């Protein structure tokens, strides 16, 4: 009898131990989430580390480039480990919506802190930071008062003076998208043809390269997202700082629609197995602490008012932003690409 009770006790203890281990494993799994991000890791890592420190939730980061990560998410379907999809342009967020890989969420915190202009109406994604795309000119060769609007860049007086990256850049596609929304297809195409006629060189490189080309005298005017100028200004490389010092920022269309702005943003995937943790991450990324990192270390504009800007960004002055609903960027993408093709903007 004693042997029977002993055997029963051992079995019960083993069952209890397995249960404890299972609960512990489930608990550990619940304290993590998987993030697919098109943002460069060195830019997003400080934010993720701060989130983990505050919440104890570990973020498993998978970084990717261009549209490859979205294609991976689509291919994985319901089996994808991704809980959050983060990207750097409203046009790409629109593609994610069209692909059906995001799910709508409800969050009083996000709805309160993220302006309606900067989120998808049904809650499929929320913007996390704002990036402006102003005109940048050579300080010593261009009179700032000579350019008041993006439309001025098509003026023949600037023939051979403009540098801009390829129309394959989603930043330029979204800008064309916004112009179609404001001006219509015909006027946008006319502008694109005039812009191409003024190119100082074939489009090459990224936005930093356009700024450097102005500094080197290859052209006098460039289009670039503003945070790239912030990165060059604060670079460890003397040549980068010199390039940044050679240009100044023009905020166009201040008497009209305002400067073109875009966003970085994120949404919760349909496959999310850590949905609550994923929502916590998005809520953290619009908190004061996270928004100060976006402003101070990434040189972007906070999604909300009241967050101090980087001194570098503040030095560029205030601007009126385009009030176009950001979720509309991407809706004219196919037409924007056709316009670029007809204009010869490669």
Regions inferred by a protein language model and the residue ranges of each:
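Short beta-strand->loop
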Residues: 36-39, 102-111, 121-122, 124-126, 137-139, 145, 151, 238-260, ...
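Ligand-binding pocket segment of bilobal, Venus flytrap-like solute-binding proteins
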Residues: 174, 178-252
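A bilobed periplasmic-binding-protein/Venus flytrap-type ligand-binding module shared by bacterial periplasmic
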Residues: 134-141, 261-274, 293-294
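A structural signal for short loop-to-beta-strand junctions that line the ligand-binding cleft
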Residues: 80-85, 103-135, 151, 161-164
């Amino acid at each position: 009898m004693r042997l029977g009770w002993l055997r029963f006790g051992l079995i019960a203890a083993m069952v209890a131990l397995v249960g404890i281990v299972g609960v512990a494993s489930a608990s550990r799994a619940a304290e993590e989430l998987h993030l697919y991000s098109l943002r460069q890791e060195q830019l997003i890592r400080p934010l993720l580390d701060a989130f983990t420190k505050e919440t104890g939730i570990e973020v498993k980061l998978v970084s990717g480039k261009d549209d490859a990560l979205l294609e991976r998410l689509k291919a994985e379907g319901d089996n994808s480990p991704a809980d959050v999809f983060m990207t750097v342009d409203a046009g790409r967020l629109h593609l994610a919506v069209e692909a059906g890989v995001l799910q709508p969420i409800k969050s009083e915190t996000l709805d309160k802190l993220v302006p309606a202009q900067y989120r998808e109406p049904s809650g499929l994604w929320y913007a996390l930071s704002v990036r402006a795309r102003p005109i940048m000119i050579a300080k010593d060769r261009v009179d700032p008062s000579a350019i008041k609007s993006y439309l001025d860049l098509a003026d023949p007086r600037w023939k051979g003076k403009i540098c801009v990256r390829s129309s394959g850049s989603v930043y330029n596609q979204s800008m064309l998208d916004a112009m179609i929304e404001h001006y219509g297809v015909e006027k946008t195409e006319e502008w694109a043809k005039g812009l191409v006629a003024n190119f100082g060189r074939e489009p090459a490189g990224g936005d930093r390269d356009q700024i450097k080309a102005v500094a080197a005298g290859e052209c006098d005017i460039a289009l670039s997202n503003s945070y790239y100028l912030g990165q060059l200004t604060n670079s460890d490389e003397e040549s980068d700082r010199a390039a940044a010092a050679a240009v100044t920022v023009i905020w166009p269309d201040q008497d009209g629609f305002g400067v073109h702005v875009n966003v970085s943003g994120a949404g919760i995937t349909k496959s999310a197995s850590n949905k609550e943790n994923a929502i916590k991450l998005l809520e953290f990324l619009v908190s004061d602490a996270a928004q100060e990192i976006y402003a101070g270390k990434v040189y972007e504009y906070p999604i909300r008012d009241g967050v101090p800007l980087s001194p570098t960004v503040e030095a560029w002055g205030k601007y009126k932003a385009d009030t176009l609903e950001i979720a509309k960027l991407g809706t004219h993408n196919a037409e924007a690409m056709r316009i670029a093709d007809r204009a010869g903007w490669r």
